[in-house]
C-alpha cells in the first residue's frame, strides 16, 4: 500500500531506518571510521534525521513515498522540486525484502499518484552500474535523458545518468 508523507511527523523514522539500514551502515563506516560499527550507524541515522528535518522537509513540495506490506515499510523514495519538475531520490528496498517486486509496486503506485497531482516531469539520477535500479525505472516508464547527473546543489556527477519520466 502506498503511503505519502509530507513531514517527518508523518513517518515512522525507526521503520524508515530499517529500509535504509544497508546504506546507513555504509555511510557510518565511511564518515565515522573511528567509531564502533554500532556508534557509526547511530551517527549516520542521526545525520539522516537531521537532513530530513532541517533540509529536505523544509522544501515546498518535498515528500516521502513508502510501500507498506502488513503495516511495515519495505520500500521508500524521496521526491523534491527540481528544475521544472521533481527529482526522485533514494529509491531503496529493505535488503531482506528485495526480489519481491516492492520497488516496482512503489514506483508504479507513486507515479500514478504523481501524474494525478500534475507532478511531472520527474527526474532520477542513477549510477551507471546500478542495474537493479535501472530495471525498475525502465519498467516504470523512465528513459535515459542525460549521460550525467546535475544535482540540486549544481554539482555534476559523470558516474550517473539522469532518467526522466513524463
Feature annotation, model-predicted:
Residues 114-126:
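Conserved GNAT acetyl-CoA-binding A-motif
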Residues 2-3, 20, 24, 62, ...:
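Polar/charged side chains located within well-ordered beta-strands of beta-rich proteins
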Residues 97, 101-109:
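Conserved acetyl-CoA pyrophosphate-binding loop and the N-cap/start of the following alpha-helix
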Residues 83-85, 121, 155-158:
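A generic structural signal for beta-strand entry/edge sites
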Residues 104, 128-146:
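Conserved active-site alpha-helix within GNAT-family acetyltransferase domains
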Residues 91-99, 126-127:
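A short, internal acetyl-CoA/4′-phosphopantetheine-binding micro-motif in the GNAT/acyltransferase core
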Residues 10-11, 18-89, 94-95:
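Acetyl-CoA-dependent GNAT
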Residues 125-126, 141-160:
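Conserved catalytic-core motifs of GNAT/GCN5-like acyltransferases
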